[in-house]
Every structure is written in C-alpha cells, then in structure tokens.
Design a protein with these regions (language model features):
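Active-site-adjacent structural elements that line small-molecule/cofactor binding pockets in enzymes
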Residues: 1-321
Length: 321
C-alpha cells in the first residue's frame, strides 16, 4: 500500500508547506499533494516549489480547481513542473462546489463536462498543440497523469472513462468500494485497463494521545462538510442517515454545538483517522484490509497544534520507514 500526505494549502503558509517537502521525502512517504481552495491559495505554484525542493517524491494537486484557470495556462504550469521534476507530477482536478464557485464570481457549469473539456485541452497541449494565432506552448516531455476528484458515483464513472486516476475523499470503506467499482467498470467499458488507473483516498487525520481531544477536533472539521448536501447525501447513503438528519436540523436552528454532537463516534471512525499514532496506524491497516491501495493522510489542526505542527508529528510518528 502506498502512503502519502496531502496538505490543506490555505491552512498553512507557503514556506511552511515547502519546508515540509524534504522531511516528507526523507521519511519515505509516497507523495505530497496540495489542497487548493477557491481564491484562497495557489496549489499549483506550491507544487512547483515542492518540485524544486525534492528529488523522488511524487508531487501534485489534490485538487487544482478547474474553474479558476484557463486550461492552456494550467497545462503550461504542469509542463513547467514536469521539467523540474520529471515524471513526478500528478495533476489532480476537481470543481469544489457550486456555492464557492459562484460566490467567487465564476459561472458554474456542469462539473463533469468542465472536467472532460479541461482534460482534453491539457492533453492537447501536452502533445504540442496550441491555440491558433498564438505562440506555441511547450509540450510535455513525459506523461503527466490527470486524476479527477470524485464525490458522486457518476463522476467516478466519468473518471474511469476519461481520467488517468481517481481521487476520493472522506469515504467510508463501503463507499470507497462502490466508487472504485463504478470507476473500474466504466474504464473497462471504455476499453481501458482499470489496473493501470490508480485510486487514492484522502483521509483527514488528527493526531493526539487524548482520544476525546482528537474526536473534538474531528467533529469541528467534519461538521462543515456534513452541512453540504453532496457530502450529507454520501454519508446518509453509507449508513448515517439519522446523523445527517440531526445535523441538518441543528444547522437549521443555528446550533453548531448540537450539529457537531450529532456526528457520532462510529461515523468519525469510518471517514477520518484520529487518536494516538498507534490507533491511527491501526486505522490505516483497517482501510488497507478494505481494499484501499493508496492512502494520503491529511493532517489537521488539533487543540493547540497547528496544521503545520500536526504535519511535522505525522512525518515523525507515521513514516513508512
């Protein structure tokens, strides 16, 4: 099983993120990816800086937002990173959500259509095609895999037909299995070899020896996802419908504390990793037994520990070697 790290780029400084790169590589982790939030941070530029600091580590975005950049400029950035770090870039793409995109002033379009158009444009530029009448962009010297973020099962299926890999996030083991099945079935139907298309699972991680403290941090983090319909629907379909109903009612009443309390321990233990290092290692093994082949851990702030401090602890106590 491959074990990597993904950093929430908007929750730590650019220098902090880049300074974590070499320790991550030296500890034997498989990858270091960057989360990008809408108009909050630049995950692609951060990945480029990490590329210049490392020599073996797989680097990339988890994800770069497809609404924020012209796809030709995204392709140019990817080619630049690949020249600095040959065959080490994974370009993860995703849409975030309608509310954030429209609030930022962008037009929301069908996300699967945007993913397909962006992917086709990226591949054209990588192959040396440019825009008529403009200077030719640099082509890619190596294959640059394009992975899609998938929340809806329909997006997972579309990724199987069009992308080079799938990036999943806060999935229960059962939901992970359904998503991967749809992804691989669609790949097979499209005449592709699903065995050559990797699937990663990003798992928010909260390291603390005091279990209640870790659980509280996880609830504070997860409650904001549970209020979004697409995440609530996924959690409900994974056996947590009653909890999602309680969260919705509490949010409707403006009661954040009750909404957090509605996220029971069973849900937390299915979608995040929390507690002592030994407990988290047991959780990693549990996901591996469920068929997860590539886990990327997402350190989060816990109590007085910042995200950067949690990442440092993660590198020290959860290193693959």
């Amino acid at each position: 099983m491959r074990l990597g790290i993904t950093l929430w780029g908007f929750a730590l400084g650019y220098r902090e993120a880049v300074d974590l790169a070499r320790p991550t590589e030296d500890a034997g982790f498989h990858n270091l990816f960057m989360v990008e939030s809408v108009l909050s941070n630049d995950g692609v530029t951060t990945a480029a800086m990490i590329a210049a600091r490392t020599s073996r580590l797989l680097i990339g975005t988890n994800i770069a937002n497809v609404y924020l950049r012209h796809p030709v400029m995204l392709a140019a950035a990817a080619v630049a990173i690949d020249e600095i770090a040959p065959e080490r870039l994974v370009l993860g793409l995703g849409p975030n959500n309608r509310a954030m995109i429209t609030q930022a002033g962008f037009t929301w379009r069908d996300p699967r259509e945007v993913l397909q158009v962006t992917t086709a444009t990226l591949r054209a530029v990588f192959a040396g095609q440019g825009v008529a009448g403009l200077r030719q962009p640099r082509s890619a010297s190596h294959v640059i895999p394009i992975h899609w973020a998938g929340m809806a099962l329909e997006t997972c299926a579309a990724a199987g037909a069009h992308a080079d890999g799938l990036m999943l996030y806060i999935n229960t083991p059962a939901r992970y299995g359904r998503a991967v099945e749809r992804f691989r079935r669609a790949a097979t139907e499209a005449g592709r070899d699903p065995g050559r298309l990797p699937v990663s699972l990003l798992i928010p991680t909260f390291i603390h020896d005091d279990l209640p403290t870790a659980r509280q941090a996880a609830r504070e983090f997860l409650v904001h996802y549970a209020r979004w319909p697409h995440y609530a629907k996924t959690f409900a379909a994974s056996g947590h419908a009653a909890a999602m109903e309680r969260v919705a009612a509490a949010y409707g009443a403006g009661d954040l504390a009750t909404a957090m309390a509605a996220l029971d321990d069973a849900l937390l233990d299915e979608v995040v990793l929390l507690g002592s290092p030994s407990r988290i290692r047991e959780g990693i093994e549990r996901f591996a037994r469920a068929g997860v082949e590539w886990i990327t851990l997402g350190p989060q702030a816990v109590a007085t520990d910042s995200l950067a401090r949690q990442a440092e602890r993660m590198i020290a106590v959860l290193a693959p070697r």
